[in-house]
Amino acid sequence: MNAFALTAIVGTICISAVAPARAQFSDDRIKIGVLSDIAGIYSDINGEGAAVAARLAAEDMGNAVAGKPIEIIVADHQNKPDIAASIARKWIDTEQVDVIADVPNSAAALAVQAITKERKRIFLMSGPGSVELTGKSCSPFGFMWTWDTHSVSAGTAQALIAKGDQSWFFVTADYAFGHSLEDEASKAVKALGGTVKGGVRHPLGSSDFSSFLLRAQSSGAKVVALANAGGDTINAVKQANEFGIPQGGQTLTGLLLNINDIHALTLQVAQGLTLSNSFYWDMNDETRAWSARFEAKTGRKPSMNQAGVYSAVRHYLHAVKQIGTDDPEKAAAQIRATPVNDMMMKGARIGQNGRVFGDMYLFEVKKPSESKRPWDYFKLVRTIPGAEAYIAEKDSGCGLVK
């Protein structure tokens, strides 16, 4: 399948209305492209669910802003940066897409960030994790919504080292995201007085982790940290249990775990794992109500990435409604100027580097006996304020920060 054919994977919502005379929107519509992993290792935590989340945000606006219809299209980047870049260029140059959203896979997101920066299009990220996206590769038009490799690793490292797990070994996905996750976790471990005993890197989409896990097992490290995500994490955790790594006294931790991963693993396998997330469906009445809407359309609870797509698209739509135009520079300024307030975040500030400083939550996976209903998987250990969870703007390396 070539890159242009991928745009055939399209879901569209389009409802017409009469526009106020003052509103100025290009092509008399707002067109949002959800660029995701539709069939690969991140499809459960992003994928079609990300498109559903974007549509829920559009529904909240009545599927129109200032009388202009909201159109949402979807494409699969197959976790390949060149395909992601090709789709982004085609969307912007020939299909008049105003916003690109989602883009799990940091290498793909870095490619899209460069294109949206050059073409002056809004880029709403809820899936990639590399801190470079709000660091040296930041953009005036790029916003990183849900988490990053620092926020998911620092809280987990702090919790485990406080329990006495001082020495670490990393099993890392060999691409931009995995490298960033290992790097940020290593910094956190060392800053807290721990040590890194080594690491090994595996190809994206690995099915056999035996050689990598044997090296981790023989390292003697107290913690075997999985610096990967999605299907890679699921496969690694399952095989680590088969090898007896947790049973042998080593602590197994996934530095990026989503509720979908726990669902796939089952509580019997995942119980006791520690993880940092920015969203959990069962936090309060608002999250439960929104998650019920999502589940009605998908048959499952949302991941934090899918919730983040909803939050980001909703925030963008409110921003352009407020200013009466989808002009990218004006929209970007309004996005930054307005704190995020929705079912996911309350009063979250957006930095000059595009980082959304929402709270993170440290969770522990429940034992099977503690779970009372479907998807009842997490126990809240600690709330980590956004200002603490993320790298400070001044230290991010972003040239936009004054």
Label the model's feature ranges.
Residues 1-2:
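N-terminal secretory signal peptides that target proteins for export/translocation
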Residues 5-17:
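Bacterial N-terminal signal peptides
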Residues 21-402:
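Extracytosolic ligand-binding ectodomains
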